């Protein structure tokens, strides 16, 4: 049995964590803008 390329799996993991980080920053930006403008 041949295992999948571990480098490819690492790249996918980094991409997923990057998307989660961008989503978290976006949510925080919305919360802060609501807090400051109200």
Curated annotation (Swiss-Prot):
Domain of life: Eukaryota
InterPro entries: PSII_PsbL, PSII_PsbL_sf
Residue ranges the record marks as coiled coil: none
SUPFAM superfamilies to which the protein is assigned, alphabetical: Photosystem II reaction center protein L, PsbL
One matching Pfam family: PsbL
Keywords from the named record: Chloroplast, Membrane, Photosynthesis, Photosystem II, Plastid, Reaction center, Thylakoid, Transmembrane, Transmembrane helix
Gene Ontology biological process terms from the UniProt entry: photosynthesis
Family, similarity comment: Belongs to the PsbL family.
Function: One of the components of the core complex of photosystem II (PSII). PSII is a light-driven water:plastoquinone oxidoreductase that uses light energy to abstract electrons from H(2)O, generating O(2) and a proton gradient subsequently used for ATP formation. It consists of a core antenna complex that captures photons, and an electron transfer chain that converts photonic excitation into a charge separation. This subunit is found at the monomer-monomer interface and is required for correct PSII assembly and/or dimerization.
NCBIfam families in the cross-refs: PRK00753.1
Quaternary structure annotation from Swiss-Prot or TrEMBL: PSII is composed of 1 copy each of membrane proteins PsbA, PsbB, PsbC, PsbD, PsbE, PsbF, PsbH, PsbI, PsbJ, PsbK, PsbL, PsbM, PsbT, PsbX, PsbY, PsbZ, Psb30/Ycf12, at least 3 peripheral proteins of the oxygen-evolving complex and a large number of cofactors. It forms dimeric complexes.
Protein name: Photosystem II reaction center protein L
